């Protein structure tokens, strides 16, 4: 039987963000990098471990080797171009704008300088919520929660001196960075 491959329409939108590079399915990337995978083998990505938002259409976080403690490709599906986004990590999880604001405007903010994902989020927050820098979104946070998500990626399970983040908003990967 022929292998079913999901097709992509990469001509719809020009990609200029951190996910502009297209790589082959199964590629391991350096820490903090994100790329697109458009040659997806149907149904063979791995196990869905999380969805954001939890209801309706959204992004699915897929672990290519669930149960492994080593680094491996992860995939995020749900983009209009039908290409998954991939990165390499030992552990990955979604984080909401509410969680980001608790970390960014609370005590941890005194330790970590502003990163590319923080700066990109400030721009989104200002346009959606009207909130100034270093101030939480407020009552309009639920609007951000519908189409904005962070992904935190860790090189190993346990203590990590550094980690990476990706910010997705309204179907676009806006920023990716490495902290620590």
Model regions and ranges:
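Mid-length scaffold segments of soluble, non-membrane domains
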Residues: 70-100
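Non-cytosolic coordination micro-motifs
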Residues: 1-45, 89-180
